[in-house]
Amino acid sequence: MKMIKGPGIFLAQFAGDAAPFNSFGAICRWAADLGYKGVQIPTWDSRLFDLRKASESQDYADEIVGTAAEHGLAVTELSTHLQGQLVAVHPAYDAAFDGFADPAVRGNPAARQAWAVDQVKCAITASRRDRKSVV
């Protein structure tokens, strides 16, 4: 990148159950209306992004990038903040960190770690797919 194109926004802090914060297209429109040029997508929030699908489908990745582009936005990052923290959790913090995990693996540190590693791997693959769509 030879120049900064403008401000980006991390969507996780705004995602919610009410419009315009409950779908990727609507939250992109909202961000663009505020003057943002890029969005960082939280990969753990299925209201906005299906991480597994993005890791398996170039068409879905193209759709996500296209939706952002329709609003004059670029996908700047796929965030794995929460999943990444769960890759290696000290036993003293098991209870505190368990809430970040998928409900199916809570209370099982080994399953939680395997889930987290898989999530990060999916994000790596999805990120490669998204990059194929970005000019």
Regions found by a protein language model. Give the residues of each.
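N-terminal pre-domain/capping segments
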Residues: 1-132
